[in-house]
Regions:
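Long, intrinsically disordered, low-complexity segments
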Residues: 2, 26-27, 195, 284, ...
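Acidic, glycine-rich segments characteristic of secretory precursors and extracytoplasmic regions
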Residues: 2-6, 12, 23-78, 460-469
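Short, surface-exposed recognition loops and adjoining beta-strand edges that mediate ligand/DNA contacts
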Residues: 40-42, 70-91, 208-288, 392-399
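Conserved, well-structured interaction surfaces
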Residues: 53, 61, 93-165, 205-212, ...
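Hydrophobic-face positions in mid-chain alpha helices that act as interaction patches
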Residues: 96, 242-356, 412, 438, ...
Length: 469
């Protein structure tokens, strides 16, 4: 771990004083979050450029979470991967089995943890945005940078909340008093997306192109553009999805497509934004890799997906570098090895949140939906070329092209941040794909239940269809 990384993680000032509660732990209920910080405490955290920077660094730490907290690192990837079909669960934990069999109960503690942790992060970013906007003592350029970072984190968090739960309460920087009482009802998905897009557009305006530091652990203008491209794709606004993806893809001085073997190292040119960790060992590696010759990995790539990687005339380099067959007894398990660092002695990987390949695939899908099949093919082929395989056929129809993009997204993004789950939901393909392999699948399973603990704390929260408290 380099010295800059140590400074990033170790020199954060006491955030519990500034933000009115720990950034590193989350409470299960809004009513347990504690009293909001006073105006004096806000000012204490934002009197100087250095102290304000430290508060924002704390938001990144909070977003990363821990190996057992479902913030925006690998635990969220696990739960969505189990709910979809890009992860096979080989364990027996009852709460995880509920995700894997799409039999979630509203009392599932992990579902409640996701909600509570993400809303704790919303609270922290709201407090930061409010304090930053009220501050008169910060250097204007730094103030803009920090507001942009906080709004990016808030938008990213809401993007997960709305795609996991559907309509969710919308708390902003102006709602700090209401937030503590947890009295707001669910807000429409459309309105939440308006806030997401507004935050990201403001962030893109305020953030600079240059990264703060060398390891891309803080967002820049292109990170905001990349997330805007994703959000617009999810909203089926293909004009803007293509526009913002193109902005990122045009930054060839910053971003490149390295070999799959190095895509996830923390100096990779593909990385647009990554969440740092203390020793360069990700919870992805800890969860996906099983140590010991006879240890069965808890989470693996299903055999049916492994068999869809191309092998002729050339073998897909993603299959060779990101999946490792492991035989235990008479059964073969396909271990996900995108992240390979399992020891601090190596310590060269962080949690990659945004990377360039996704932007090619976003633009390909946007172009295909706008009848630009030639442009879509060019973008898919850019991803396939990095994987060492031939381009797709030039004779595909729009429907065939979209199917090819779905497959390419699976091969490229499996096991990462819920991409497969969200893809199947937003394209209305969840039932067609999951019903044949999920015996208990129901169409209402596309949303997680609103946690019963949250409904007890706030009786204005309605339950999603298909669930009971």
């Amino acid at each position: 771990m380099n010295n800059e990384m140590k400074r990033f993680l170790n020199n954060i000032i006491p955030l519990s004083v500034i933000m009115g509660g720990s950034l590193l732990t989350s409470c299960a209920k809004f009513v347990e979050l504690g009293a909001p910080p006073t105006q004096i405490e806000y000012q204490d955290g934002f009197l100087t450029d250095a102290s304000a920077q430290s508060v924002i660094l704390g938001l990144y730490v909070s977003a990363t979470g821990t190996a057992t907290n479902a913030n925006l690192s690998s635990m969220t990837s696990l739960y969505t991967g189990l709910a979809a079909d890009d992860l096979q669960y080989n364990g027996a934990d009852a709460l995880l089995v509920e995700f894997y069999t799409n039999g979630l109960l509203s009392t599932n503690g992990l579902v409640n943890n996701i909600w509570g942790n993400l809303y704790q992060l919303i609270k922290n970013t709201n407090n930061a945005v409010a304090a930053l906007e009220a501050s008169n003592s910060l250097t204007p350029a730094i103030k803009d940078q920090l507001i942009g970072e906080a709004k990016f984190i808030r938008a990213y968090t809401y993007l997960y909340l709305v795609n996991l739960y559907g309509d969710v309460p919308l708390y902003t920087a102006d709602d700090s008093g209401v937030f503590e009482s947890a009295v707001l009802p669910r807000t429409s998905t459309d309105r939440v997306y308006e806030q997401i897009l507004s935050d990201l557009q403001d962030a893109e305006t305020k953030l600079g192109v240059a990264y703060q530091g060398t390891f891309r652990g803080r967002v820049n203008k292109h990170a905001a553009s990349a997330l805007l491209a994703r959000a617009y794709l999810y909203r089926k606004d293909y004009v803007n999805a293509e526009l913002y993806a193109s902005k990122v893809l045009a930054a060839t001085d910053l971003y490149s497509m390295p070999a799959p073997s190095t895509s996830f190292t923390n100096t990779s040119g593909e990385i647009i934004f990554q969440l740092a960790n203390i020793n360069g060992v990700t919870t992805f590696a800890a969860n996906y890799n099983a140590v010991g010759a006879t240890t069965i990995p808890a989470y693996t790539l299903p055999d049916r997906h492994y068999q869809t990687f191309e092998t002729t005339p050339e073998e897909d380099l993603r299959k060779l570098n990101w999946v490792t067959p492991k035989t235990v007894g008479d059964k073969v398990y396909y271990t996900i090895t995108k992240y390979k660092s399992t020891s601090p002695a190596i310590g060269n990987e962080y949690h990659v949140v945004l990377r360039l390949a996704e932007q090619y695939l976003i633009r390909a899908e946007a172009r295909a939906n706008r009848d630009n099949l030639e442009g879509a093919k060019a973008d898919i082929d850019a991803v396939r070329s990095r994987a060492g395989i031939e381009g797709i056929s030039s004779d595909l129809t729009e429907t065939q092209m979209l199917t090819a993009i779905e497959t390419e997204r699976l091969h490229e993004l499996f096991g990462e941040y819920g991409h497969r789950w969200f893809d199947l939901k937003r394209t209305d393909r969840a039932t067609a794909v999951l019903a044949p392999v999920k015996a208990n699948w129901q169409t209402t399973d596309v949303l997680f239940p609103i946690p019963s603990a949250q409904r007890l704390a706030n009786n204005r929260l309605t339950q999603n269809l298909g669930y009971e408290d």
